[in-house]
From Swiss-Prot:
InterPro entries: BRCT_dom, BRCT_dom_sf, PES. This is Pescadillo homolog. GO terms for cellular component: nucleoplasm; PeBoW complex; preribosome, large subunit precursor. It comes from Plasmodium yoelii yoelii. The keyword Coiled coil applies.
Amino acid sequence: MHIHKLKAKIKKKHQEKYLTKKKIQKKLFLNESEFRRLCIFKGIYPKDYKDIPLKFRNKFYKNKVYYTRNDYKKLSNEKIIQDFRKIKTSLKRYKKYKITLEDNERCKNIIKNFPKYKLDHIIKERFPILVYAVEQLNDALTAIIAYSFLPSNENIGIKNNLINQSIILRNHVKGYYLQAEILQKKITWLIPHIFTPYFDKSIDFKIITNFIEYYVTLLRFILYKLYRLDGMSYPPKEYKDLKNEKLNHLSFDKNYITKELSNELETKESTEDNIIEENEKKTKNGKTENCEKNDQENEKKTKNDKTKNCEKNDQKNDQKNDQKNDQKNDQKNEMKQIEHDIIXNDNTKSVKNLFKNHIFYIHSNMPFDVLSIIILSCGGTICWNSLYSPYKYDDKSITHEILEVSEENKNTQDSNKINNINEYTYKRSFIQPQYIFDCLNSNMILSCEDYNINKTLPVHLSPFIDDDNYKDLVKKDEYTINKMLSEDPQYNKSIQKNKTNSENKXNNYNDNENDMSEDEYNNAIRQKLRNDALNNQMEAENENNYNPQNDLKQENDLLNVQKINNQENIKRNKLALSKKKRKLYNKIEQAENRQKLTIEKFIKKSKNKKKQK
């Protein structure tokens, strides 16, 4: 074969590797929405124009969307395409019988037998091992939790069924940990605050629903596997009484239900069992009376046969009652393991027993869901304002109370309770919600003095920093920033004014206690202590650890910080410019860099000539 013919064949092969979106849709007989949904489920994404080799880019257009031939093969062999076609035909039939023929009975039959598709086989293909599926939980959990807060609006594309499913899965996940370790892999996700949703027309919510439809099946698959590893059944049973309560996740877990609440639920179940047993006894007595009458009338042979049948029925009923009693005893033994321990152990530092023997009362204005799950997962107990709470507000066994006092809370229902704080000052400690998060991050119980009501809270540090090198860098940056601020004359003038004001306030505090608040006094003292600490640190470095190299390092650090700040400001200003002005600015920068390079070369040549002489 001639060389030119070989080259022509090679070009055709490269051209056939990439197919446009419209060609694939025509071959598969799919709409854009169906094709998009199928690509999301299969994890297939289009190719960039830059990925195509340079030799064959001339015959491709930048604005079009291209897929590879291997992607087309994966999509063509998919079973869901047939389900999409069945859904189309069923919708056409429904419109025909509803609008033209007005036959409601057939419409009901179509709705009952409406086709559905499943994504189980796709997840097994994409994730043959459970560890690969766990790696993608970061995006799945954040999307499901955010979608559960949205209201249903099918005109935009937000379906009510998926919202309910995402809420149920959110309650199945035990412990709303922002970071969890599953199968030796760390997973992080976000729990957003309660917000009022704003529907933007630029956002296509139908695409989001397609992603969440995939994430819901993935999360169910992982939960099923994890429950089976622990020897548990999925989906777990739920208590009907706790469905409409704030703590929906308690209705799925027997281990987290407290002693008093479990007794109430057992009494309801026992009453139902007693009613069933009474009905069974009545049926027994009726059967025995009928047997005696028939025995007197019939012969001796028939008597023996009937008495045997009656005895067998009695034995079966006795066995059923024995099985029910055994199940009740097993449930009671399980609940005894969950009893509240009175003795406090200060040495327990593990996360599971961190809040052991602590009882927290949570007010209605607090972030109830997150706090409740953290406390329960760490071995604590919870109280709240409802009939199903295990402890009431007036109970003396409560150790901590979580609330935040503000001007808004004074008009709420909790105002009466907040005004009566003096009654419980010696028995319980009043805490802000940051206390629980800081205790969990440090894996130890902290003192409650810094987290009392109407006090400025300490800095909330991120718990995800594991590298010691990163911690050292943060400390250096803080020191350099404080040093830069101390060197600025404007900042020093403001500090001096604050010093004089704080000293005058400290001297005249005893005279003007009613005029000055506690927060202002504490802020003034903190500013004074901070400035004193900086001065002492600078003096100690100059006296004991004086090295000229350290001074050079500090100066270099300051220069680097200034350069970084200047670069960030330049980038921000670039974004505000138009395209033409950006191009001009880039050309100016390139010209300046060229001039600098030429000057540096000229200086080097001159230095080398002097050395040679």
